[in-house]
Amino acid sequence: MARVILPLVGGAWLLLACERPVDVTEQKRNAMVEKDIAARGIKDPRVLDAMRRVPRHLYVPPAQAEHAYEDRPLPIGSGQTISQPYIVAFMTEQLHLTGKETVLEIGTGSGYQTAVLAALARKVYSIEIRPELAAEASERLKRLGITNAEVVAADGYRGWPEHAPFDGILVTAAPEKIPPPLLEQLADRGRMVIPVGGFYQELKVIERSGGGYTEKSVLPVRFVPFVGEAEGTPFPAPTPAR
């Protein structure tokens, strides 16, 4: 609430209390979090706070902005979509982030999930195979003041070994099988959240402990297919998005 002091005749002053301007998108965002995320079982207060703060309408095309706070995926161009908010929150919560972690994201898309991760982790490295999306997301994140996320245009199948190991890995497209390089780049006690499958997909949480891995399926999902599984072919070094 803002306060305004107005001068009156005779040297007196009048103190008025004024409500701050209503931010309609903030209201919609808060309503989305309460109705579509918290009410469906997401409990981590840091995740809920990040979902309230990251403006989804700035990560979708202008024609889709009016639908930004509906709990559904939206097209972002190049045949790709931005995930529904509940799935973003659910996958993020599965990483158990405390703010000290280094996270790898495969599939930057518009950068929305990247921004949510950046609000919760120390550093986020994100790979997008489509150069045009990588460039747009990188510019968008910089414009919005997000300084702890780095986006590259590359094939995510090989991960980003230069910055491994990662405390968390989050994959936003579904391969038929879990890419071995991503398993190798997961830190001890690290967690990977990844949709796996073809027509029928399951969201899996992989946890590394010592030399072994545990795997559990947590949710049936439907993601776009993983593109660029280049196993057995030379893999170019990641190129920073511009």
Each language-model region and where it sits:
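Bacterial N-terminal signal peptides
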Residues: 5-15
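Conserved nucleotide-cofactor-binding alpha/beta core module
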Residues: 96-210
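Class I SAM-dependent transferase core
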Residues: 18-104, 115-116, 120, 135, ...
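A short, charged
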Residues: 236-242
